[in-house]
Structure formats: C-alpha cells, structure tokens
Amino acid sequence: MNLRSILPVLCTLFPLLTFAQERDSVIHSAYGQDSVSCMMEVSVYARRSEEIVPSQRLSGKRLESLSSFSVADAMRYFSGVQIKDYGGVGGLKTIDIRSMGTNHMGVFYDGIQLGNAQNGLVDLGRFSLDNVEEIALYNGQKAQIFQPARDYGTSGSVYIRTRRPRFEEGKNHNLRASLKGGSFDLINPSLTWEQRWSKRISSSLSADYTGASGKYRFRYRRVLPSGQVAWDTTAVRQNGDIRSFRVEASVFGNTQDGTWNAKAYYYDSERGIPGAIVNNVWKHSQRQWDRNFFAQGQWTKHVSDRYKFQVSGKYANDWMRYLNPDTTLMYQDNKFRQNELYLSTAHHVELLPGWQMNLAADYQYNTLDASLTNFVFPVRHTLLLALATQYEYRRLRLMASLLGTNVWDRTTKGITSDPVSNATSRWTPAVYVSYQPLKDCSDLSLRAFYKGIFRLPTFNDLYYTEVGNASLQPETTRQWNLGFIYSHDWYRGLFRHVEVKADGYFNMVDNKIVAIPKGSGQYRWMMMNVGKVHIAGVEAMAEAVMRWRRDWSLVLCLNYTYQSATDRTAPTDNDPYYGTYGGQIAYIPWHSGSVAGNLSWRNLGLNYSFIYVGERYHTSANIRENYEQPWYTHDLSATYRWQLPRLALTFALECNNLFNQQYDVIHNYPMPGRNWKGSVKVEW
C-alpha cells in the first residue's frame, strides 16, 4: 500500500465531516455545535469520576509546555512508567506500566485500540504531539463502563485523544502551521486545517513531515569488574536517520440524539537502526521501512434517558520491511504485512437510579503474511464478550466487569501441508471500589481494585520460523491496588488547586513468555512459558496550582515511584554470581521520579522539568557487570505568544538534557547529550 493509493481514500472521506466539542473552556449543549466565546478567564478544576481507577493525564497547555516531541517523550512524566528508548528521533520507543511487560499495554487512538498481532508492540515515538490534545494513562481499565469489550482486555491502557476543532463566534475555519528544527538536523513542518461545514458537521485534516540525520556525539565509557577502565572515548551515533510522513483526516458529527465520527490515518517512514555499541562496532547498516494505514469510526445513539448504544469499526493494514545487508552476520531482507478488521457494539442500560450495566461484544480478524522461509501464514479470529456493572450509593461506588475471550488461530504449515488450528477460551474478572470516608467532605476518596487478565502470545511468539512455539500458553497477570486521592480547590488566595494521590500495588505475572536456548547449543532459541515475576510498588503524585496578581500563575507537579520487581521463575537458580532468582528484573529501577513546573506571565511561559531514573540492572542476574548507573535530565523551555488581530504567533525555544548527562536507557544504546529545538507556530 503506497501513498498514491491512500490519498483517494482520504479525499473521499474528508467531505463527510462532523464534530462534538469536549470539556475545557467551551460551553455547549449535549449535542450542539461547538463555538468559542471570549469571556473573563475562570479556572475550574472539576472532579473526575474516573478517579475510582488510578489514572494520570496530560492535556492542553500543560502538555504543550513539556519539552516533548512525541507521545513517548511526554509519558516519561507519568509515575510507574518505564520507557524503552533506543535513542534519537527515530529510535523505537515503547512503554511498560508497573513492570508487567510492554505487551500488556493497550494503546487507544481516539477510542479504538492500535493493534499489532505480529509482535504486540506499538511505537509511541511515531505519534507527534502536534495533533494530540490529551494523553491519559489508566491502571487496569477506564472507569466508565460504557465502552467496547476490548477496552477491558489489558493490564494498563494509554488513551491518546487528538485535537478537536473549536471555532470562535462567526468563524468557520482554523488553519495552523508550525515549523520545528534543531539538533540532529531535525526538520519538522506540520499543517492542520479545521473546517465547519454546517451546524452539525466539522472536520480536521492534519499532516506533518519529520526528517533528521540522527547524528549526535556521545561518550562511551566501560569499566571492568577490577575497576580498570576498558573504554573511554567519544564518538558520533550513526545510522539513526529518519524520514517520515503522516496524514490523517477526521470527521465529526452530531445528530439530534447522538454523535458519530470517522478517521483515516496514514504513516510512511524509512529509518536506520543504529544498533548496540558492542565489540568495537560503532556503525550498523540495518534499515526499516513502515507503512501504516487505518480507517475507523464510531456511532453513539441515546435511545432514551436509560438506554444508549455504540457501534465501532476499524480496518488496518500495516507493512514493514527489514533489511540487514551485512553478510558477515546474516543477510536478511524480510517483508511483513498485517491486516486487521475490528467490529464492536456496546449497550448501556440504567437499571435503577445509581445502578448501570453495560454489555459489549467485539470481533477481531487478524492475518500476517511474511517473506520468511517455511512461514505458516497465521489467521486469528477473536471474539470478546464483556459484562460490566456500576453502582453508586451515597459515598460508595462499586464497579465490576467480566470479560470472556475466545480465540481461534489457523495456520498452514508450508504450501502443501494441512491447516493446523489452535483455540483459547478464558473468563477474567475485575472489581473496583471507591469510598469517601468523610461525610461532609468529598475531597478525600479511598480506592482499591483487583484485576485478572492475560495477553495472548503474538504471531512472532507462536510462529516465527525456528523460534516460535505453537504450544505457548497465554501470559497472565493479577493486580491488587490500594490508594487514596485528596483534591481541593480555592477560588481566592495564592493556592487555587492542590491534589495529592498515592497507590500501593502488588502484581503477579505467570507463564511469562521468554526466549531460552534450544537444544544442547546456545545459538538456537525458542519461546517458552517459563517466567514468573512478583512486583510490589508505590506511586505518589502531588500537584499545586498557584495564581497571584492576576497575570502570574505557577503549576508544579511531582511524581515518585518505588518498585521491587523480582524474578520468581526458578528457586533453584540461586547461584550468587549467575543466578536470577530474586533479582530485580531487567531495566526496572527501584526509585524513579519527575518534577515539572510551568511559570506563566501574560503571553510568556517558562517551563522546567527534571526526570530521574535510579540504579538498575540490564538482566535479572544482579551482579556488578550488569549494573546500570542512575541517570537524570534537566529540560528547560520558553514560549512567547504574540496575538495579532487575525492571527497568533507562538515562538518556542527548548534545551533538553541541559547539563549534558551521558546515559543509556537500554544497555549499549547511548542517548543524546545536550540538544536544542526551536519552533514557530502560526494560527489563523
């Protein structure tokens, strides 16, 4: 699928257009058309019903104020999140919540999950913040029960909500253009056009291009167990270039008794894979090409005050080529193509005042084609059934769900062999409770939850040539959480809003899917269910909003995480030097945290952020050779907005890693030192 074949689809979809405004500073009716009116500024901090579920979010000006280029960069400021970052603008960036594993994360883009049946990974580095309005992180699942069945099926969820058109009174279109540039030869132009076609229909068309050489200087230093310095040199990171193009068209509509929306998305990239710095090899030659397309839509109808339903659908086509031209290792030129079809219906009923119920059914169809020898061309059918209920009585709120997962895989072994089928069927529960202990004070809430869920082996886990294992069982997780949230608002004085929340948790991961040596040699590997992990941790967050002299405001946010994530696979594997039993699992720090501050005066903004990741090991054998030092970065940025009669200009300058800290997130993948970005944005 190339760009030329995608553009007609976008052009066909674009005139079908609509939008329903959400929250923030816009006042609207339930199904009315959006408009923005100028009025005296008032700060409102509404209590979110979702707080029965531990959640974190970044949105609006606070999201813009962070020195972040992609969704992955912004999520570094969430507690309990580990970012696997291989460095540079084009490096792969995935996330892990509460040490349960990247594949247990669900990433939802405008309400529908992004899938990858091949390896289960979603590269959050490819989602620019230019078109993102809010990023929300939930432990377990969203608190609202009116949602598709697939939303109940992950251990943690990230919801990315793109920008919605907002129109000033008497205005029917918005145009926004921006240009970013900076270190690593970065160039990033973007353009967004928003149009109101009628009272009930509006649209958005957004596109951007990213180009960078990915070259940056780094210091490579390694010390032997004896204390002798083995390496200490400075080099330039090579083969980290990227060229990518993204375009998406969205249409939004309001009806008399509901809403609908549709979206088409296309992403095309070519990038180098810089590789690890090992064996005195400083430059690699591997390349990767990606083409991702999906079209999705949702329709919600309120039949009565007590009954509403939602229908969702999606088609996705993903193509990837991996090239390793180095014949001294093994020449590879592999191509993969995935197809996904997804349909969902959800039905919400209010049985009695305070008692609600939701029934959802989803169907998903996945295929994978590959150019590998003896590949089995798997096909997967997934049927999900979810029943959820929510009950509120005075200061008590309960929510429970039961998810049924039925999966059928079908493969063809070679060209002439008979098909082989495999089936999985399981039911998994979740229970959430929230209670306000003080009768006359709604500022304090206690919360707790339990959730059991599993993740299916990916197509690579099951069927990758010579490595896959078709007998794999699902990898299961069980989560327990206990916490509180305190939130208070003031309408006068220095402090306008204070929020403190903390959660303690314990997670168990069983049947963990890992690669182990196959046979008598160590050069062949197979995926097996042999892993077990116990995770105990604490997350804490504090936020304060201050305002004085009308023009000045200050927002401060602190996050802290403690985690003990230990390998509990084999009690006999307790050798003091090579053993992994009881060791902290790879790349999970005991301590981590962040500080972010935003100081505003009229049209000027000054933003500071600090991120700290404590000591950790790059394998579960916690010995000196595997030790990774703590790292931290300071980021600083300044913005100025110049308002003119018909347009607004915003200038920004940011410095990341201000003190030039040399560090690795992943062992032997050096990260950039001090780097700069500048941008200008025009809105009219």
Give short role names for the model-derived ranges:
Residues 129-176:
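A beta-strand signature from Gram-negative outer-membrane beta-barrel systems
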Residues 310-322, 446-451, 475-536, 543:
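Membrane-embedded beta-barrel scaffold of Gram-negative outer-membrane proteins
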Residues 352-362, 366, 370-507:
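Structural signature of Gram-negative outer-membrane beta-barrels, strongest in the C-terminal barrel
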Residues 76-116:
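Extracytoplasmic beta-strand/coil segments of soluble accessory domains associated
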Residues 395, 497-508, 526-617:
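Gram-negative outer-membrane beta-barrel transporters
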Residues 22-27, 216, 234-248, 252, ...:
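Flexible loop and strand-edge segments within Gram-negative outer membrane beta-barrel domains
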Residues 36-66:
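N-terminal periplasmic "start-of-domain" segments of outer-membrane beta-barrel proteins
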